[in-house]
Each structure stands twice: as structure tokens, then as C-alpha cells.
């Protein structure tokens, strides 16, 4: 009995020594969790080819996937996945990029059983059209000039911007500014100026006595100060004065 126990103990010891500490990894394909992208849907890494591959699952079927293609970058493969899903699911597709719906313009394609779906062809075609769009700074000079000319012709007219000489002004004294603002407040639609230099900046005054007092206080604090405003439009100057008035009103409350 003791001999059998000793023999079994030696057998277990020899088997434990023969077994490695870490089991060998089974040969074959790597798991999907280890090769898929951490952010993009339907994007996997193929290590042997060194490229990103795209496969999409057919809606309404269990386990059926269609091979779309391979790309060098994960972003390009994600665009391919979006194009294929738009062709398969339409507006209800789960996309990697929010702008793929209007940027790719993919038509809805029905899935044909047993054949490669038109979704793959639509995805490839739309991705090729998306690649043809020149990136900023990579196009030719003539194309960039023509594009800038078209943008300039279609752009809305911008507000006039005054030069540095036109925008330079000196604030008046407190008494003179109060007399000037009293004349402006007398009319509901009066327009005035706080400048003495050439080309003064005209802006609408708020018909409110308390606002006039606040403006008078601001000018009193900034008395005899030369202010240089470079390339500011009239609207920006008005917004600046309004912001100062608002902060001063909050401070006095």
C-alpha cells in the first residue's frame, strides 16, 4: 500500500514538472476582441497583411457578414464601413462619423442572397469619390485659386473694417461727454460719436438714463487715456462698450 502511494506521488510530481507554467496559445486566427479597433465599428487589424480590414454584418440575418475591403488607415476603413452600412440600413445605420450621411451620398441598396451585395460596390464607389476630394493644402495652385475665387464670389459681404488711423481716438473729459450724451439721449433714435479725430465711429446710443450714467462713469475712469483700436468694426466696438457696461452694472448691483 505504501509502495503504491509513493509511486502515485512520483507520477504526479513528474507530470507537474512536465507541464509548463503557462499553457501554449492555440495556433490559428487571433480572437476578434484582440484585433478589432477600440473606437471604430467594423474595423479590424490584419496582422499578416499589415492593413485594416472592414466587414459588415447583414441586418436581419444571423452571423452573415460581407467583406468590404482593406485600407491602410483605420479612419479610411471606418468611412468604408459607414458607406456600406448606409447602403444596407439607410438612415438607421450606426455610423463611425456623424458627417458620413451627407458627405458620402450613398444610395440605399437591397441585399441579394447568395451574391455579393450592392452595398459593397456602393461603399467602394463612394469611398473612391471621397478620396478624390483634395485635402486642404494638397491641391494644385490653380484649383486653390479657382476655389478661393468661387468662395469669394459666393461669400456674403463683410462689415467694413476701419484702419488703425481711422480707429484711433481720444476720450473726452467727463463733463464734455455728459453734455454730449445728454444731447444724444434727448432723441430716441439719435446717433452720436465719442471721437474727436478724423472719421469718427458712429453708433446707436441706448436711450436709458442709467446706462448713460454708467457710460459717464466709464469715461470718467478712463479720462485722458489714448486708446488705439486696430482693425475693429463698428459692431465690435459697440459690443465692447456693451460688455463693459454689463460688467459694471453687475458690479454695482
Swiss-Prot record:
Residues 39-98 bind DNA. This is Dehydration-responsive element-binding protein 1D. SUPFAM superfamilies: DNA-binding domain (SSF54171). The keyword Transcription applies. The gene is DREB1D. The keyword Nucleus applies. Belongs to the AP2/ERF transcription factor family. ERF subfamily. Induction: By cold stress.
Amino acid at each position: 500500500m505504501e509502495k503504491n502511494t509513493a509511486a502515485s506521488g512520483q507520477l504526479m510530481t513528474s507530470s507537474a514538472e512536465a507541464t509548463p507554467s503557462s499553457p501554449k496559445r492555440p495556433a490559428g486566427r487571433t480572437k476578434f476582441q484582440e484585433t478589432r479597433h477600440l473606437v471604430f465599428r467594423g474595423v479590424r487589424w490584419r496582422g499578416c497583411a499589415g492593413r485594416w480590414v472592414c466587414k459588415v454584418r447583414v441586418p436581419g440575418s444571423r452571423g452573415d457578414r460581407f467583406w468590404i475591403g482593406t485600407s491602410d488607415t483605420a479612419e479610411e476603413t471606418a468611412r468604408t464601413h459607414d458607406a456600406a452600412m448606409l447602403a444596407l440600413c439607410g438612415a438607421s445605420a450606426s455610423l463611425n462619423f456623424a458627417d458620413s450621411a451627407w458627405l458620402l451620398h450613398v444610395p440605399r441598396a437591397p441585399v441579394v442572397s447568395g451574391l455579393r451585395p450592392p452595398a459593397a460596390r456602393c461603399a467602394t464607389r463612394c469611398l473612391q469619390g471621397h478620396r478624390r476630394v483634395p485635402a486642404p493644402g494638397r491641391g494644385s495652385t490653380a484649383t486653390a485659386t479657382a476655389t478661393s475665387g468661387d468662395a469669394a464670389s459666393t461669400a456674403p459681404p463683410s462689415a467694413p473694417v476701419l484702419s488703425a488711423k481711422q480707429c484711433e481716438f481720444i476720450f473726452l473729459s467727463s463733463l464734455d461727454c455728459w453734455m454730449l450724451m445728454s444731447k444724444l439721449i434727448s432723441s430716441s433714435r439719435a446717433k452720436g460719436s465719442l471721437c474727436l479725430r478724423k472719421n469718427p465711429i458712429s453708433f446707436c446710443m441706448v436711450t436709458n438714463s442709467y446706462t448713460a450714467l454708467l457710460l459717464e462713469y466709464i469715461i470718467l475712469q478712463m479720462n485722458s487715456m489714448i486708446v488705439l483700436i486696430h482693425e475693429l468694426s463698428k459692431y465690435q466696438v459697440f459690443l465692447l462698450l456693451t460688455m463693459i457696461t454689463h460688467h459694471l452694472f453687475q458690479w454695482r448691483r
